[in-house]
Amino acid sequence: LVGRLLGLKISRIVFASFFSFIVPLFRSKKIIKENLNIFSKITPNINETEIIDSMWKNYGMTFIEYTFLNYFKSKNSYTTIKNENLLSQIIQEEKPVIFVSGHFANFEIMSMEITKKKIPLATIYRPLNNIFLNPFMEYLRKKYICKNQIKKGINGVRHTIEYLKKKHCIALMIDQRVSEGEKINFFGQPALTTTLPAQLSTKFNLDIVPVYIQRDKYHNFLVEFKERLNPSDFKIKLELSEELNRILEKMIIRNPNQWIWTHNRWK
């Protein structure tokens, strides 16, 4: 309600400031510092203060943008798509692909833009820890982003396969730690990593499409669809998962200010 009263532009400024100045007072800085320490060993001379401040501001803007998802859904002026021809190819081929990305900028924009192109899609999501907020977020995602929401977990894998058999593409974030994953190098440190994209890609012979998302200085979005990965180019599934981590690293290096450094990625 506050966001609607203020409008999108003012709401972004207000919530970016709130998350930048107030929220860090109640959140531990330990994990962020540890993560940036790992990152700095690969990319020295980073400005930690700028990265942390920008991250919190992006958090705030993303949070309030959930109340404006209908704007983003109904208009194309907020988003620029790079390599859009790849989406046209996917539509013509009528064969599913697996879209993967990380929590960059407003990460929900990826699935929204794919569905706006009329590509059948199901997205895998991780429920929020907040049991009161989670139902509302699920409602917004189903209404404005993608109606086919798959809850992460064993049952989610089964539902994912069912959607693939119905020729739906799958979208998921691959940058968070998963207890059932394998330890794969990420910025030079072993990190529990989801192998689901590689498993599905290999089993069903599906291409994987990495997607980069960025918020520009005007707070519009760039959604860049990267070159496809074909499972036949990799000897084993582990190699494919390793390549996905390398691609993710490049995305983070490209714009570390808009990635979520609060997640305990290397636990």
Predicted regions and their residues:
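Hydrophobic alpha-helical segments typical of transmembrane helices
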Residues: 10, 32, 55, 110, ...
